[in-house]
Swiss-Prot record:
The L/FRRG motif is required for recruitment to PtdIns3P. InterPro entries: PROPPIN (IPR048720), WD40/YVTN_repeat-like_dom_sf (IPR015943), WD40_repeat_dom_sf (IPR036322), WD40_rpt (IPR001680). Belongs to the WD repeat PROPPIN family. Interacts with TECPR1. Interacts with ATG16L1. Interacts with ATG5. Interacts with WIPI1. Interacts with WDR45. May interact with NUDC. Interacts with ULK1 and RB1CC1. It comes from Homo sapiens. This is WD repeat domain phosphoinositide-interacting protein 2. It comes from the Eukaryota. One of its GO terms (molecular function) is protein-macromolecule adaptor activity.
Amino acid sequence: MNLASQSGEAGAGQLLFANFNQDNTEVKGASRAAGLGRRAVVWSLAVGSKSGYKFFSLSSVDKLEQIYECTDTEDVCIVERLFSSSLVAIVSLKAPRKLKVCHFKKGTEICNYSYSNTILAVKLNRQRLIVCLEESLYIHNIRDMKVLHTIRETPPNPAGLCALSINNDNCYLAYPGSATIGEVQVFDTINLRAANMIPAHDSPLAALAFDASGTKLATASEKGTVIRVFSIPEGQKLFEFRRGVKRCVSICSLAFSMDGMFLSASSNTETVHIFKLETVKEKPPEEPTTWTGYFGKVLMASTSYLPSQVTEMFNQGRAFATVRLPFCGHKNICSLATIQKIPRLLVGAADGYLYMYNLDPQEGGECALMKQHRLDGSLETTNEILDSASHDCPLVTQTYGAAAGKGTYVPSSPTRLAYTDDLGAVGGACLEDEASALRLDEDSEHPPMILRTD
């Protein structure tokens, strides 16, 4: 997620972008001295900044380890890592129409592509690489980076909103099907055909997220009060949660837990909501024996005579757990992870911090802040809540994509790049001898990083 402000300035820690890896991946050969044994589950965070990009690993609450830093490319506005491999896709503000695919462990550039307009988002899984422009989407084969398909003339999408499932069998892409209402277009990236159009919301979409299995899709609109979950590819509404009633907010991110049991939603407010995806078993009706019981039965029966909007509110789920962030107005991205066998909520924010909260999977309630780590390169780590005064700033609700669409701060080349072929993406020179038969999804060729303990 891009963390730049509306004016294009980086956050307090000079951050431009932050994103968690697609899943919690086992790192082979981790040191016993580090308390990780031979195999350990490590959560990874990619950060782009004015000075380059970095990768952090998080195997415990107390330690955020920087495993890689690159300062060769400045103003990195997009940095997407393929799970915990060494493959990374990079876009810079200085060349916003150019995508570079690199092997960061070797320090080599594998290939690059130039597009006709600003790149607003890049998504990766082990089958496909997706490049999102304002009015088109490019589907690349991750094995050789060839363009397989182009979705043209999509509704204007200045925020670059899209989501890609990480599941190989359910490899779906979701993106807005309308610029005026909350329709979701679901596209099968393996068979290269449209799968479904889901009428998710009345207002335009603001956030999308697949679960790990690729069978559920969470959606939120610009209004930000209701979160919905649909089955994929059928498009049946499975869950509906109400984030709030009093005010409309800008949803920053949605994230499922790896088991698909929880869904988190962060916004431009100080509250992160966590919903539990469980179907309540219907109990057989019982005759009420008290006055309050009779009153409740009459109340539920009366809902059938109320307007549909009011009836829906009675049936919407509420947050299972909440998190109170020490700031309001910063762009942020959340993730639900299991670290040291305990469910945690992780929040990376434009103020330059990573916040870690404990989640009680049985009781829920308000989550406790366990740790916060600096992401700007310093070694500062603290348990204390930052002074709220240091977080006071105008609300930041516009993404890099939205700003780019309005031409507010993204540099553009003097001449517009024209399409040179029917696919619309210009491939640069491959810089590896074996690029003609790249196997970018193979860990043997692009192995995970090994945690260093020296």
